[in-house]
């Protein structure tokens, strides 16, 4: 028998090595090249659509499409994280695993406060998840009914889950794309409603108990964009800012068919009577004109009246080949949606949640940053990966143009500007995109105003830019330069001035996780 002291010393050495390895992993996992510093990312491996977004007992729950065994798409699980402020996140164990009915595709969650399902009690309501189950064997066999809708519930704030014994709650009637249920309570009819994506349209269902569902109506086969399959719908009521009017808004993601190619999210404004949705808008409207905001939906059960949104910050054209290593994909920042009358009509507008300002650290303010002179150019050095920039642009003539470039010593850059046609754009032709022919390009969006004054708020992270205009327009795009951007360059022709520019460095949301 070996000396007991030697055995104890050997055991302590093993424990110490394991602890050091774990700490090194934690110290490194948020600091790899391209790892976002204030956007949610999985600790490891693949992530796509946000799912099951619901608020309960002070926590915002984010479930998400996740493959825990690789950094490309694979058998889908529901990953899980929670936040108390929509900014910093705590990773939790995987919530839902594939079972005999298939992989766990996208869906939603609701709090059954009236215990209509019988899963909980009025004192302890269940968190109920509804999701698509995708049976790969059925798809490979050439069948059309391989996607069904299932239910699971939790009685401990989403920490553990039980599958409903009588799944599926909606069987497939023979439709190839039949997925992504979003569920909400409709008080006027005292029923749960479900909006479901079905190839090139959505279908609406009703239920008294989240378990027994009846078909109500369909929408969209002859409306909206139809360049690809409809996915990840959402339906909710909103107040029109500054009035007593209320409208219903429907979000529908589409892939491909977005304005700048690949994936994107369109929306419709109209009325919903509990049975049918009737749109008012005739034009195709988009939540975000950038290339990298897809499958976004909103949180349920939020207690402060805000309509809060989160999207997957990628595009199916290249999501599986972007040059990240340990993990793949990030979410957008959490956003507040508003319904507002603009210079071009009633629009859904987007703004970063107010809580994001808590990340602000050092700041610099420059007055009269750019004067109304011919072919002006100004440069500022940047330190760190995460920044927020606020600036006001004054245009003294219609054809005035400007461009803000974030660049490095290798002349790589991503550019943000407004052209002579008053189009907002992001230019990432030289931002590092050799991994995909669909990545590089100059991509255009629409502003909701023709005013001579434009306020911009730019959120720059290690590999993404989110551009918010004061009229609520937004563009989101990724970039992957060989070296970190370390300078900001502003160029303009005559007719543009910038009376004030503010730059904030932002703290990393993973610093607390490291501790």
Language-model features: locations:
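Beta-rich accessory regions
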Residues: 242, 271-283, 287-515
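Bacterial Sec-dependent N-terminal signal peptides
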Residues: 1-25
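Alpha-helical transmembrane segments and their juxtamembrane interfaces
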Residues: 12-16, 138, 480
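Beta-rich carbohydrate-recognition and catalytic domains
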Residues: 20-181, 185-231, 239-289, 304, ...
